[in-house]
Amino acid sequence: EPPQFPNYASALTAAGAVVRFLGEEADYDGLLLPGGGDIHPSRYGAAVENCQGVDQERDALELETFRQALEAGKPVFGICRGVQLLNVALGGTLHQHVEGHSKVDGVDGLHATRAEGFVEKIYGRRFMVNSAHHQALDRLGRGLRAVQWAEDGIVEAVEHRSLPIWGVQWHPERLEEGWRCRDTVDGLRILRFFVSQCG
């Protein structure tokens, strides 16, 4: 269990979910794909240019788990690496490095975004999010549409046109009331949305 996973578990629990990790239980109502290291570029037909923390066993496990969830019609929500993974799984590609979206001195960055689709329904059209990534979505996978953008045009959220699949590039699990960064939205609201879709 990677060290960041308790953040996701506590945030999902606060949002009303009963959390299970892969391998603990065969049945589940929805799949959350969490953040982490970069996906190997061979998964989207590219050469390695700028990658950090690649774990090809994790890539394989999560891609297969996503495929199974897709076949079963389970709701899926991706966060940071997770939205990148579901994009790649659906045939999309990634920018291997973007400037201005990484942590600074170990602290999440902040930036303004504009939204539509499911994100706008939750938070409104314009709001601030945290930022802690150096890769980003490039060509979108089959059926995905962008619904949130940073001011530089980087995609911050997607939704599927017909399937229960959503993802965000930012970290709602770090935005819980009480320890979220000043001026950012309450991440529990979007996690509650996901949990509500898993009923």
Where are these regions (language model features)?
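N-terminal beta1-alpha1 cap of cysteine-dependent amidohydrolase-like domains
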Residues: 1-79, 88-95, 99-123, 128, ...
